[in-house]
Amino acid sequence: MKAGVLALQGDVEEHIQAFKKAAQELGISIEVIQVKKPQDLKEIATLAIPGGESTTIGALAKRTGLLDALRDAIKEGLPTLGTCAGAIFLAKEVRDSVVGETKQPILGLMDIAVVRNAFGRQRESFEVDLQVGELGTVRAVFIRAPAFIKAWGDARLAAPLKHPELGQIYAAAFQGHMVATAFHPELSTTVVHKYMLNLAKK
């Protein structure tokens, strides 16, 4: 099987290693490629969109012609994981905890509303064990994380958390072949990447 990691910026190498380790645990042989141009998407069975800076991802995706290619591939059913900034990139509704509505280029594919920087800046990093729907308990690493506040259509929110200002928020979302996490699973667990590989096998 071939998996891809969108390699415009963010923690690309960590996702590559997480896919490799997940495949090893599942007994699947895997090749993981860095997705940098539209034709790379034709080769892969599943995709991870890493964290980093969501406005940068959007701008670079637009410039490289990947924005439309990604949107088309994911719409056609490519199992896709978006983590942290990658989750913001997948969402239909994005606002910033400080500046309100953002006009950044996004894929706009998941029926979820996301608040950027909901947990403040870098110093607001923390780890916690979370119940993430059918994935069970996951060790979640949050770094300048967003928060999911609403879902509609057939999107489902998971991993509930209490936020000091926003109240009840969620750190994961599922919709068909798409998964979004506010945390960085690639830093602490293979559970989420195994889930993506199993989706790709179906």
UniProtKB/Swiss-Prot annotation:
It catalyses: aldehydo-D-ribose 5-phosphate + D-glyceraldehyde 3-phosphate + L-glutamine = pyridoxal 5'-phosphate + L-glutamate + phosphate + 3 H2O + H(+); L-glutamine + H2O = L-glutamate + NH4(+). Its EC number is 4.3.3.6, 3.5.1.2. The gene is pdxT. The keyword Lyase applies. Keywords: Glutamine amidotransferase, Hydrolase, Lyase, Pyridoxal phosphate. Catalyzes the hydrolysis of glutamine to glutamate and ammonia as part of the biosynthesis of pyridoxal 5'-phosphate. The resulting ammonia molecule is channeled to the active site of PdxS. It comes from the Archaea. Pathway: Cofactor biosynthesis; pyridoxal 5'-phosphate biosynthesis. In the presence of PdxS, forms a dodecamer of heterodimers. Only shows activity in the heterodimer. This is Pyridoxal 5'-phosphate synthase subunit PdxT. The keyword Electron transport does not apply. NCBIfam families: PLP_synth_Pdx2. It comes from Pyrobaculum islandicum (strain DSM 4184 / JCM 9189 / GEO3). Belongs to the glutaminase PdxT/SNO family. L-glutamine binds at G52, E53, S54, R116, I143, R144. PROSITE patterns: PDXT_SNO_2. GO terms for biological process: glutamine catabolic process; pyridoxal phosphate biosynthetic process; pyridoxine metabolic process. One of its GO terms (cellular component) is cytosol. One of its GO terms (molecular function) is glutaminase activity. The active site is at C84 (nucleophile), H184 (charge relay system), E186 (charge relay system).
